[in-house]
């Protein structure tokens, strides 16, 4: 394993140049193997987990979901506030910011972005909860691609460009995650579900953050500074891939759902009656995805 890690380090050094010495010795950053192993295990669980749960009752996970989503909401809020204040203190340039031009504020940004990297490991739990609750329809290509890639990308970011122009996407994403995980946390509480009408606007916000990130990253290409251009080109390409996948998700989830509901409504009127609707919601996920409710385990 040490030989493998040394070979990887040599390859990365030849490909990307020397690492940023400010993160030497930081947890999970010294070598790539732990991040790679976590990613492989994640993909194995995504593959094998639904097979294991196929003949088993889904878990409720309600209590732990409330705590989990509250924790990620607070962590995202902390990261957003720290990044905003760090950028202000370092007088960061919106158009392009090098990795060694912000003074003491750079170290503040680096510390917060390490938490951002680590949060991507924590967010693997999103998928594991889907598996335990047998919400396999939510384990999409977009979901797995986004979760698996972000952890790996941010390992490289933290080792080579841990501050400077790297701050912008993480700041926007932290803000979106405050909204997203607060929504998920509230949706775990049955009495709150009738008031959660703003789910699709979170997806719109995610698409907006990708567009804004491309615009801000492009500024660094048009008006370059000491921040490496290769990282900026990669960021733009990655954002385009996410926009493509998220746009497809939005169309599949909301536009087609609206067309389907209108057709059902027209069909009911043509038959001379309107379908009756239950006076209560038995399962939030069933309502959202038109899935028959399943009996859940209490553990």
From Swiss-Prot:
Species of the source: Bos taurus
Residues annotated with N-acetylmethionine modification: 1
UniProt keyword list: Acetylation, Cell projection, Endoplasmic reticulum, Fatty acid biosynthesis, Fatty acid metabolism, Lipid biosynthesis, Lipid metabolism, Membrane, Phosphoprotein, Transferase, Transmembrane, Transmembrane helix
Membrane topology note: Multi-pass membrane protein
GO cellular component: dendrite; dendritic tree; endoplasmic reticulum membrane; neuronal cell body
GO molecular-function terms, A-Z: fatty acid elongase activity
Subunit-structure text: Interacts with TECR.
Pathway terms, separated by semicolons: Lipid metabolism; polyunsaturated fatty acid biosynthesis
EC code(s) of this entry: 2.3.1.199
EC top class, as a word: transferase
Function: Catalyzes the first and rate-limiting reaction of the four reactions that constitute the long-chain fatty acids elongation cycle. This endoplasmic reticulum-bound enzymatic process allows the addition of 2 carbons to the chain of long- and very long-chain fatty acids (VLCFAs) per cycle. Condensing enzyme that acts specifically toward polyunsaturated acyl-CoA with the higher activity toward C18:3(n-6) acyl-CoA.
Catalyzed reactions: a very-long-chain acyl-CoA + malonyl-CoA + H(+) = a very-long-chain 3-oxoacyl-CoA + CO2 + CoA; (6Z,9Z,12Z)-octadecatrienoyl-CoA + malonyl-CoA + H(+) = (8Z,11Z,14Z)-3-oxoeicosatrienoyl-CoA + CO2 + CoA; (9Z,12Z,15Z)-octadecatrienoyl-CoA + malonyl-CoA + H(+) = (11Z,14Z,17Z)-3-oxoeicosatrienoyl-CoA + CO2 + CoA; (9Z)-hexadecenoyl-CoA + malonyl-CoA + H(+) = 3-oxo-(11Z)-octadecenoyl-CoA + CO2 + CoA
Coiled coil: none
Compartment annotation: Endoplasmic reticulum membrane; Cell projection, Dendrite
Protein name: Very long chain fatty acid elongase 5
Domain of life assignment: Eukaryota
Family to which this protein belongs: Belongs to the ELO family. ELOVL5 subfamily.
Gene Ontology biological process terms, A to Z: fatty acid elongation, monounsaturated fatty acid; fatty acid elongation, polyunsaturated fatty acid; fatty acid elongation, saturated fatty acid; long-chain fatty acid biosynthetic process; long-chain fatty-acyl-CoA biosynthetic process; sphingolipid biosynthetic process; unsaturated fatty acid biosynthetic process; very long-chain fatty acid biosynthetic process
Transmembrane regions listed in the UniProt entry: 26-46, 64-84, 112-132, 139-158, 168-187, 205-225, 226-246
Phosphoserine carried by residues: 285
Presence of the UniProt keyword Protease in the record: no
Record has Phosphoprotein as a keyword: yes
